[in-house]
Amino acid sequence: MSQEFSHLSVLLTETVAGLNIKPDGIYIDGTFGRGGHSREVLKHLGDNGRLIAIDRDPQAIIAAEQFADDARFSIVHGGFGQLADYVEDLGLKGKVDGVLLDFGVSSPQLDDAERGFSFLRDGPLDMRMDNSQGQTAAEWIARTEIEDMAWVFKTYGEEKNSRHIARCIAADRDKTPFLRTKELADLIARICKSKERNKHPATRVFQAIRIYINSELEQIDQALEGALKVLAPQGRLSVISFHSLEDRIVKRFIRRHSQGMSVPHGLPITEAEINKTRLLKAVGKATKPSTEEVEMNKRSRSSVLRVAERLEY
């Protein structure tokens, strides 16, 4: 594989093990990336197994050509939030044995300065997962009011200096528009000092802008609900998150569907009726990468894997 598509998949063994793969099963890799998880899933599938991958990054679709000769594999160009629609179009709703979701930005996306995700490499201020559509980060910064910008930084980046950063960006953009990642990163580094060791002051702002312009959290909500619709009984859901906002959504989703409906005290509803509303059960505890994996791949250090199983309908 070319270096362009090289990528170390995070929690690879643990994530695929969580799927409890059947050789003749049907599986969804909702975040294909550069194919690391898909390759591992295919190793566990027999001749009659099937893997459907999804990704909205055009470069990921190109990377999927590595599996062009494998009849078990197919890929859809689109967002993982629409996975239920894609599966339903294939007539596979309720027949899927496992769904894998990895919410991290792939290393090739971060390392390619032209994609505009990295504050360490100068490139166009883009940040779109699908760079064929939607507004760029530069366009968003140019158009957004100070209060709205501060809200995004605080909500999606958990940035404590959100208002100060937004005001400084607005003051500077009135003189010269922000078109490059280095221009934005350098401004934030000048006005803010990160109190977190080995963390660039622009980390949270870049995260916030990326999440916002790609509607990432909305996509996560849609993908989780979609997985619930397409999974067969005893089907597995393996989800990797990379920051607290993502993990909080996944944790609450699994908890909500594991507990069933909340019933006010005194209502004549039986335990059996409540059990019918329990759609998932958590499988094991949240898993974090080993010390060895973090040493080999520093980008894995914040990852968390959660696994759940679809209960009977």
From Swiss-Prot:
Amino acids binding S-adenosyl-L-methionine: 35-37, 55, 80, 102, 109
A GO term, aspect molecular function: rRNA (cytosine-N4-)-methyltransferase activity
The protein's Enzyme Commission number: 2.1.1.199
Catalytic function, reaction form: cytidine(1402) in 16S rRNA + S-adenosyl-L-methionine = N(4)-methylcytidine(1402) in 16S rRNA + S-adenosyl-L-homocysteine + H(+)
Enzyme class: transferase
Main localization, broad class: cytoplasm
Keywords: Cytoplasm, Methyltransferase, rRNA processing, S-adenosyl-L-methionine, Transferase
Gene Ontology CC entries for this record: cytoplasm
Compartment(s) of residence: Cytoplasm
Keyword Methyltransferase: yes
Record-level GO BP terms: rRNA base methylation
HAMAP family cross-referenced by the UniProt entry: 16SrRNA_methyltr_H
Family: Belongs to the methyltransferase superfamily. RsmH family.
Function: Specifically methylates the N4 position of cytidine in position 1402 (C1402) of 16S rRNA.
Name recorded for this polypeptide: Ribosomal RNA small subunit methyltransferase H
Origin species: Shewanella violacea (strain JCM 10179 / CIP 106290 / LMG 19151 / DSS12)
